[in-house]
Amino acid sequence: MLSIKWIRENQELFDEKLSKRFIEPMSSKIAMLDGEKRKITSLIQEFQHARKVKSKILGNMASKSGEEFEAIQRDVKHINEKLEELEQDLNNNNELNELLNMLPNIPDEEVPYGMDESMNKLVRTYGETNPNALNKQHFELGTKLNLMDFEQTAKISGARFVTLKGDLAKLERALINFMIDVHTKEFNFFEMSPPVLVRDNAMYNSGQLPKFAEESFATTNGYRLIPTAEVFLVNIVADTIIPREKLPMRYVAYTPCFRSEAGSSGRDTRGMIRLHQFGKVELVSITTPEESKHEHEYITNSSETILQKLNLPYRVMLLCTGDMGFAAKKTYDIEVWLPGQKQYREIASCSNCGDFQARRMKARYKEFGSNETTLVHTLNASGLPIGRTMVAILENYQNEDGSITIPDVLINYMGGLQKITTHGE
């Protein structure tokens, strides 16, 4: 959520920043609604003060009867009625909060202006792409190996699900352990194993609600399946004041993730690129405003290191204003090369959300010996999605006979297995 105080004091700049997100000017409407709310709040405070004064007079009166006593009693009753009316007006005046809840984060100055992904900026590349490489797609390879099942799975669970079998299931497990080891041992992230069900308020705090309600799976009793472990990990600091010396706080977690893929009809309908359920290792960092820019590079490097160790070609893109996520002020997308598609595809997003999530969840820190608190900055990164990493391995490590060579760093995690071959029935 954006700061109403900042909007109030920077209306022209606010509209300018919104325009970079391709949103019409909102400052006038927000200022009007804010003025109404502040007027009601001011009246409530005045009446509360008047009630306090008159109640004190009543308490100090020697005689608890008589015209003067009864007149003041009537005044207090009238004040209470008026307060009830004003507080009801304030509770009903939800338009301002509803409007603020739908506004995305303000882009950082370094973010390029642009409408869509075609305007994203190339930051760096890693590895060489070979236009003459074997180019079967992952679902062809996995199906031929008899280790990836879509058909029978669809009969049981529907479209956009997959069952991995045998050595591909083992590869999935190996990748999880490998990624967690790198992030914890080399980058000092603290491992967590969180629930996959959260309450709606946790989804609100992280920015998924209310704007993206249709993109998640909801239960009938106020819970939602997480679309990413970020939801739980950032909420660890909700409604807390953190000692400055404990920052940064870095968390890593592997979880299944669940997305309805609303609005993705017709996109990536084959294979493992876009599923309703997928596993992902997620990174979250909680830090200070002064350190968040450095932390953004740090958390991005942690994600990149996984691909480097797997020797997978990739590039890093700085997303433009029109392609960034709702809660982000600056985002790097890491795109891995897929020979089967002959293109780079997104495998990770690494975002600095500034104080946007922190304001929603009231997460603050303070210096030792100080009573003043400041909103933390939150950052997140995919570190990485297991399915898309498997896709990249299958396509980049495929052999003429359809077998898959195991990347060197995974051989020990695979119990010494060096190649995945066809599994017989």
UniProtKB/Swiss-Prot annotation:
A Pfam family annotated for this UniProt entry: tRNA-synt_2b
Keywords: Aminoacyl-tRNA synthetase, ATP-binding, Cytoplasm, Ligase, Nucleotide-binding, Protein biosynthesis
GO BP annotations listed: selenocysteine biosynthetic process; seryl-tRNA aminoacylation
MF-aspect GO terms: ATP binding; serine-tRNA ligase activity
Alphabetized SUPFAM superfamilies for the sequence: Class II aaRS and biotin synthetases (SSF55681), tRNA-binding arm (SSF46589)
Any Gene Ontology CC annotation: cytoplasm
Primary enzyme class: ligase
Localization (cell): Cytoplasm
Chain sites annotated for binding ATP: 259-261, 346-349
Catalytic activity field: tRNA(Ser) + L-serine + ATP = L-seryl-tRNA(Ser) + AMP + diphosphate + H(+); tRNA(Sec) + L-serine + ATP = L-seryl-tRNA(Sec) + AMP + diphosphate + H(+)
EC number: 6.1.1.11
Residues the entry annotates as binding L-serine: 228-230, 282, 382
Keyword rRNA-binding: no
Pathway: Aminoacyl-tRNA biosynthesis; selenocysteinyl-tRNA(Sec) biosynthesis; L-seryl-tRNA(Sec) from L-serine and tRNA(Sec): step 1/1
InterPro entries in the record: aa-tRNA-synt_IIb, aa-tRNA-synth_II, aa-tRNA-synth_II/BPL/LPL, Ser-tRNA-ligase_type_1, Ser-tRNA-synth_1_N, SerRS_1_N_sf, SerRS_core, tRNA-bd_arm
Function recorded in the entry: Catalyzes the attachment of serine to tRNA(Ser). Is also able to aminoacylate tRNA(Sec) with serine, to form the misacylated tRNA L-seryl-tRNA(Sec), which will be further converted into selenocysteinyl-tRNA(Sec).
The protein's assembly and partners: Homodimer. The tRNA molecule binds across the dimer.
Written domain comment of the UniProt record: Consists of two distinct domains, a catalytic core and a N-terminal extension that is involved in tRNA binding.
Similarity annotation: Belongs to the class-II aminoacyl-tRNA synthetase family. Type-1 seryl-tRNA synthetase subfamily.
Name of the protein: Serine--tRNA ligase
Source species of the chain: Rickettsia akari (strain Hartford)
